[in-house]
Structures are given as C-alpha cells and as structure tokens.
C-alpha cells in the first residue's frame, strides 16, 4: 500500500495519525498492523497496530496489539513520505486516509526481488491495465514486471500480467507471459483495475506509473 494522497498533512506525505482503519477484522480485538518500508523494502519503523476495543475505550495506533504500549510522541510523530510503501496485515480491514483523494500521477517502485510488493489503484476511479506503464532499471530478464490483481480477500483474481520491453523485438506493453508471445485476450484495455483495488507486483527496481485520474 502507498499513502500518496493530496491534502493529507502536506503534498509530500502524511502522518500516521492521518490514517484510520475501518471494516470487519479477522484479527483479535480488531487490530491492523502497519510497517513503513525503506526504499530498499526493509522495515523502517514499527510495526504499529490499529486497536479498536470499545469496552476498554481504546481506539488508535499503538506499539502492540493489546493497546497497552503507546507510540512515543503519538501517531502524529510518525511520518509517511508521499509514495512510501507500507506493509499491512489485517484481512478485510480498510486503511482510510484523511483529506482529498489523489488527483495526480502516482509512481510505485517495486523493492522486492524475491517476494511481491503490495501496490494498488489509489485513484478514485477505475483504470485499465493499458494505462499503466513501467520504467526503471530491472533485475528481471528483458525488463519484465509481473502484476497480479487481487480480490478484496487478497487472493489472485486475474493475471499474472507481464510488462515486456524488448526493443530488439519491437515489443513493449502488457502480455500474458514474460517472453511477450502471448497476447491478453481483448488487449490490456480489457483488464479493469477498480478504484482502491490492490495488486501484487514483482520486479525489483522497476517503477509502475499510474496516470492522473480523469475526474468528472
């Protein structure tokens, strides 16, 4: 996930206190765990737990799941830079930022070479796969980035789709395989990524570019 929203603290980022959590939780006491990541994909700080225990009058971010360990300086002391990724754990829960929704281009950089990076459509409108492009240095062969769309429960809904950029073969775009020999039926424009829908990406050092949304 990536808190890249305008009007949240400022245009360069937000504070943990700007984020709240809603929805049904399968974790005990309604906790949601969040870890800010460095540019290389390692944990920068945290984890921080969202605790919502009405019987104990507890609601907010803590350093433990029981809500007994306060964050030094409070949640407002934890900064999340614009475009910075965070790992989250809490099936069925929604992380809700304060302020206006994003209206500008967003660039996610995949940091994990052995696992997947959690990303998503953080714009308020549905977009299609053909609107997404990939740039940057790749450790994967032929510059591929693999993307899997997820259901609300976190399972793969469709894909994987591969970004292929092989100038010698005049291939550039999304395909069903890494070699770029299998076309997506109906093309990339037929694959819709709903507003707020998450997806997994694999391709260390590659940047997935999401265009600014077209708003009515």
Where are these regions (language model features)?
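N-terminal exported-region signature
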Residues: 1-216
């Amino acid at each position: 996930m990536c808190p890249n929203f305008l009007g949240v603290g400022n245009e360069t980022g937000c504070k943990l206190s700007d984020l709240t959590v809603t929805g049904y939780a399968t974790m005990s006491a309604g906790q949601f765990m969040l870890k800010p990541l460095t540019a290389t994909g390692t944990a920068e700080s945290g984890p921080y737990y969202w605790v919502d225990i009405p019987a104990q009058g507890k609601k907010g971010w803590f350093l433990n799941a029981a809500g007994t360990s306060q964050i030094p300086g409070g949640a407002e002391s934890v900064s999340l830079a614009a475009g910075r990724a965070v790992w989250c754990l809490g099936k069925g829960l929604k992380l809700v930022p304060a302020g206006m929704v994003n209206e500008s281009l967003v660039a996610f950089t995949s940091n994990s070479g052995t696992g997947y990076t959690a990303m998503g459509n953080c714009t308020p409108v549905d977009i299609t796969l053909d609107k997404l492009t990939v740039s940057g240095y790749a450790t994967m062969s032929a510059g591929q980035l693999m993307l899997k769309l997820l259901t609300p429960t976190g399972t793969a809904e469709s894909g994987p789709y591969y970004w292929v950029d092989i100038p010698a073969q005049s291939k550039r775009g999304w395909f069903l395989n890494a070699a770029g020999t299998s076309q997506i039926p109906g093309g990339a424009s037929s694959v819709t990524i709903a507003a707020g829908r998450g997806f997994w990406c694999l391709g260390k050092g590659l940047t997935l570019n999401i265009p600014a949304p077209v708003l009515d």
